[in-house]
A protein has these predicted regions:
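Glycine- and acidic-residue-enriched helix-capping/strand-helix junction motifs
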Residues: 32-43, 162-166
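Segments of small-molecule ligand-sensing domains
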Residues: 288-295, 306-362
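Signal peptide-proximal N-terminal region
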Residues: 38-59, 63
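Single conserved hydrophobic/aromatic residue that forms the stacking wall/gate
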Residues: 1-12
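Short, well-structured alpha-helical segments in soluble
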Residues: 68-84, 194-202
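Extracytoplasmic ligand/sensor domains, especially the bilobed periplasmic-binding protein
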Residues: 87-89, 93-156, 161-169, 247
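Extracellular/periplasmic periplasmic-binding protein-like sensory domains
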Residues: 221-298
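Periplasmic-binding protein-like
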Residues: 26, 81-91, 109-113, 152-158, ...
């Protein structure tokens, strides 16, 4: 029955029943932010590719504005109660009322942008795509110590401390200490000789700036590059942050020479086959080029739309029990959902490491 929205409450009561038509609603502030339009454009491409494989879908799209009153007007519409899934909102103030509505009506709610919000801890039907930092960090630490079990870590401190990375760095130091991994700290103005004195021949030497800024990179890259050239026998890497994606073009040669790694929960490269295909299709659909910002919102819309709508078409009310089987190759954003507690929803804990190898290869390391 198309009008019955089957949600988490039903999982324990009935056998899964195929949804004859998936009903999905997008609630985003389209007029206010052009990235929301890009997200919608990508989402629409996902809907189209699923329809081509025979999935029956009804998509409802509403401009949610920024006020709770606008949201309430939309939620009062009859059709909203029969949705299988709602994607939105963008604004923080709309999350709680939308979450309450979704929970009351047994509807899955996918929150694509916000990292904050307590609702995911209380509502079992919420999926939070943008991982809260603390969850992301613990995932990065685990991957780091797996990738570099024999590391010698050298932190590079800027002259004025970067508060933004303080939590990440202090957590990483704790993790390294517990694993017995040696570490030391040098300043951004360290000479090549000072840097050389920190190296250990029996270990992988990993330099980690304690700031994600391009300014710090510009300062340390010349000395590190000389260090690598003059010590070819040593294993040396530079490890960094998601925002390095935006500076890659400026430092590409250095990144390859320094065998750079950075972590991110989203990454695409215009040379990856899936990205090439998507970029061409987007151009054909909309007669314009993709925005070059990161993350790319059209790709985010596609990845999110494809994952959840495909999941509902395959598993309907049993989606939550089959999440690990959803093994899709994302264009940009990967998904690895984990329930936050017994009565809460899911957060996305997916993290990639991106590596620029000395052979001029770009590798996306997936840890699952």
């Amino acid at each position: 029955d198309r009008s019955v929205s089957r949600g988490l409450g039903d999982v324990y009561k009935r056998q899964p029943q195929k949804l004859s038509t998936i009903k999905a609603a997008l609630l985003l502030p389209f007029q206010e932010d052009k990235r929301m339009v890009e997200y919608y454009e990508g989402f629409l491409m996902a809907v189209d590719s699923l329809k081509r494989t025979g999935v029956s879908l009804d998509l409802y799209v509403y401009d949610s504005g920024k006020d709770i009153s606008t949201l309430n007007t939309i939620l009062a519409k009859n059709e909203m109660k029969s949705m299988n899934i709602i994607i939105g909102p963008m604004h923080q103030n709309q999350i709680k009322p939308l979450s309450d509505f979704a929970e009351k009506n047994d509807i899955r709610l996918v929150i694509p942008f916000s990292q904050k919000g307590e609702e995911v801890f209380k509502n079992p039907a919420i999926y939070q795509i943008n991982t809260p930092q603390s969850y992301l960090y613990s995932e990065v630490y685990e991957h780091f110590t797996r990738q570099f079990p024999n590391a010698n870590v050298i932190f590079i401190e800027p002259s004025s401390a970067d508060k933004e990375k303080a939590e990440f760095i202090s957590g990483l130091k704790q993790e390294l200490k517990s694993k017995g991994i040696p570490m030391r700290t040098v300043s951004e103005s360290a000479t090549k000789e000072t840097l050389k004195a920190t190296l250990r021949s029996d270990k992988e030497n990993i330099f980690i700036p304690t700031s994600g800024s391009n300014v710090l990179l510009i300062k340390v890259l010349p000395q590190l590059t000389l260090l690598v050239r003059e010590n070819p026998a040593e294993k040396i890497h530079l490890f960094g942050y998601p925002e390095w994606q935006t500076y890659t073009r400026d430092h590409l040669e250095n990144f390859f020479e320094l065998d750079v790694y950075f972590y991110s929960s989203f990454y695409t490269n215009t040379l990856f086959p899936a990205a090439v295909q998507f970029t061409n299709a987007y151009h054909k659909w909309y007669s314009k080029d993709l925005a070059s910002k990161y993350p790319n919102y059209a790709m985010l819309g596609f990845d999110t739309g494809f994952f959840f709508l495909k999941g509902l078409s395959l598993y309907s009310s049993e989606l939550e029990n089959n999440l690990p089987k959803m093994n899709l190759t994302p264009i940009q954003t990967g998904f690895k959902f984990q329930r936050v507690n017994n009565w809460g929803g899911f957060i996305n804990k997916k993290v990639f490491f991106i590596r620029f190898t000395k052979n001029f290869e770009l590798v996306k390391l997936d840890f699952e």
